[in-house]
Amino acid sequence: MYQFRSVTPRIERYREKVRNRLIIGDAAKEKLKYEAEIRYQNFPPMIQKPMISKYVIENMPIDIQEDEFFVGDMGGKNWGDSHALAWVLMTDIEHTWPILEDGLHHAPMDDPIYSKQLLAIAPEDVKELREIINKKIAANDGIRPEEWLPDGAQEFFALQASDYGKIGGWPVMLPPGHLTPGFQNLLRRGYADIRKEAQDWLDAHEGNVQGDNMGRYMFYKAATIACDTAILLTRRYADLAREKAASCADAEKKAEFEKMAEGLDWIAEKPARNFWEALQQVMMYNVFLKVDNDPGVTSMGRFDQYTWPYLKKDLEEGVLTMDQAQELVDSFFLKINTFYKGGFGKTQQTAGIGHLGQHTTIGGCIPETGEDATNPVSYMVLEAMSRLELHEPTVSLRCGKNTPKEIWDCAMETSMRVGGLPLLQNDEVIVPAIIQELGFDLEDARNFAFIGCQEITGSGCDYPAPNGSAMGHSGIYWAIVLDMVINNGVNPMNGAKAPDKVCSGYLYDFKTFDELKAAYEKMATWMLTWSATLNNYTEFEYPRIYPFPNLSITTTGCMESGKDVSEGGAKYNSYGGTATGLATTADSLTAIKYMIYDKKLISAEEYLKAVLANWEGYEPLRQRIINEVPHYGNADPYADEQMKYMIDLYYGISRAFSTHRCKVYKCGTFGASDHVVQGEITWATPDGRKTGDPIADASSPCQGRDVCGPTAVFVSSTSFDHSHFMDGMALNLKIHPTALQSNDGITKLEDVTKAYFDQGGMEVQYNVVDSKTLKKAQKNPEKYHNLVVRIAGFSAYFVDMTEAMQADIISRAEHNL
């Protein structure tokens, strides 16, 4: 078995502080942001955006915490949440969060959104944030796409069968993520060199801006402001480190602060020189983007690839040991875990409480040669996640035919310690698919990374908008669509009806199974096309609502073209969405086909009555469907055929979609925890699922229906073409811990996974835990404080999850090998 390093006392202390911290929201940043919005309200959007960032960064409180190796925070209080406006907007904090002895409002354990979180906020901060909200509402502040909508949109919304209940909500937050910033470009150049490129263009065109160049003028001017602001942020921390050094009595700590200040001064403008500076420059840019971009999801990219040259140099020069380097990596990833962002409504529930999607990619291949790229930092990332029992960030290991067995072993051991991490991703499928589906050059395809949950993107050269630009995952709820199709277009959950032009009757009106599928195709095409149309509407508004020059300065293509990422300036552009829980719909179609059309065991009229009755009074029928009808995930072609049908239908419809920014719509079959939230608003389905129960997660089989082991799941999964899904896939499997207690067990799981990859499988993630342990954790959470599990698109501490999400994990089938 893989042997992990020990954890240093300093990292142990730091880890306990991070895990057990009280997250304090504050109004400071939102207040500064509101002041800046008023001050610069008449500026052009491209200039206004970086000017607001500059004002906030000039004035926001900063601090350096005890035991930190790296600096930079989103909030000013105890690694807090500077986005607490979301808390106040979504929650009646004044009347539902009690004030405890420390004088702060604390989130109660039964809060519907922020349950089980150690969150607190001062009454005066709540008051300030409430005043800002009320002022914005009174002024009807900002461009809000929902104020005017394309004809027919309200009819679509009323169905409540998609992520578009209302575009963006209030205030509008069009997510300029998920994405991978150009960390490698920044490390190579530094801010001063990037700024010089922009300033040279401005100097060459001073007083003579003609034709299309006015847009470029605005962009390059914004780029200079962005660079100046990033430099300012880093220098503020350098000055603070010097202040700490001046007042520090401990000689060792004093020297550390002085060295930190010197390094920060250097990387404020120049490229990093060593491993610590590289990590700090990446961290500071990450903070810069988060301060600027409230709703965005900025991932860490190919962390091991862009940091290894600096560590290699330090090791060769003898200025750093491997153990010291591991301590730095440990600290870096603990620091990432201090970033917290409260979200809005469904986003908060589906993306994970405070989850920031800082997906980190390791392994894979060298872009220029295609050779295996695994290096010592690859192992250090896994060691940090496993030894420190971290749930954030998500880590993906890119696996190819030449991936070393040692990193496989390390990955399996990590999965045993922190559920679902790393995600195992198949280079042999993804690299050629990126070229075919997205049009990437070979080197850029080999250099791909993962973002958010498990979406696929280029490394600092791509603006992928993998979940669209509006709401949730920009998708439709496929199980609700089926309920509507068999009920003459009516959603049984709310009584809303689709337009007559896409309604084909009731289940008993379809004389053949092909007629039912034709009706489903008509409804699904109308629904998904509307979803894409609403995304395109918000995409069209996007450049004047949310230009993103702070990101554009490191994104390949933007500085060359003089165009912001929101305007299509990146080298590659795409957008997309995801289909969560297709197995629920596939199993429902299989059940209808089996029970009505093939075996003729029940009439269509009676079957429909059972579904509309939420199976009440029909339990024997429901049990027969569950136990007799074949289900996806068991290597049964009868059931797998319908999953392939659903997958191909989704992909086929989506090929027609495009925006003004790009011509590529990417399909995905993943979700964060959408399947739980979607299930809450989905009526009973023909597969025997009851109203309110979760639908299947991501591209996985329905909970508990995969009963023939992992190999059977893999056979079913590869019944369709994974290469079509360049927005990402997620296949979750729960493995019983006893299966991996020996080296033979670990090797067997590795071999099964490799065989799955050889057959065209793209991704898999393993929760190595048994239901007995999870039930114990429910009863005694204090004994399982650090138990990490994978939901679908993110990992979480089991004891911090809602009861519905805990129940979903427990309900999944356990597999032995």
Language-model segments: which ranges?
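A conserved hydrophobic secondary-structure block that centers on an alpha-helix together
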Residues: 244-254
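Extended non-globular scaffold/tether segments
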Residues: 221-232
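Conserved catalytic cores of very large enzyme subunits
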Residues: 2-223, 256-259, 263-266, 270-817
